[in-house]
Amino acid sequence: MLVNITLNGKKLTREIEADLLLIDFVRNEGCLSVKRGCETSNCGLCTVFMDDKPVLSCSILAARADGHAITTLEGLQEEAAEFGAFIADQGAEQCGFCNPGFIMNALALFRENPEPSEEEIKEYLAGNLCRCSGYEGQLRGILSFLAWKKNK
């Protein structure tokens, strides 16, 4: 089946198998920030933006992205690097495996609500799993970033 997908601003036309998952499509195109974790839509590691909304790419067929814009962390380098520095500064990068999903979802939250409360942050990021940091570093990084951005 032929699909037309805009990936990180680049228009692509690809022949794909009907059962190809979006996570496999973006990884095949070299977007390795998108991680395979639980494969049941429970961990947030595979988060990408579809038309600027966060979706879990492990549970969406690539065919559903036909005609849509998909953005991965690679497509948000400037924005992600700025924010990622605050995550790292707060010790949330023990292994770093979960960071792309956290960063994608945090950026989605900031777009939806530029000044979220701590409780709203916790609620929004509840679907992101981290196996080693206990979430406090990510939360501190987000709060530090928001304070910096507000005073910028």
Please report, for each region that a protein language model flagged, where it lies by residue.
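Signature of N-terminal electron-transfer/Fe-S-associated modules in redox systems
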Residues: 1-152
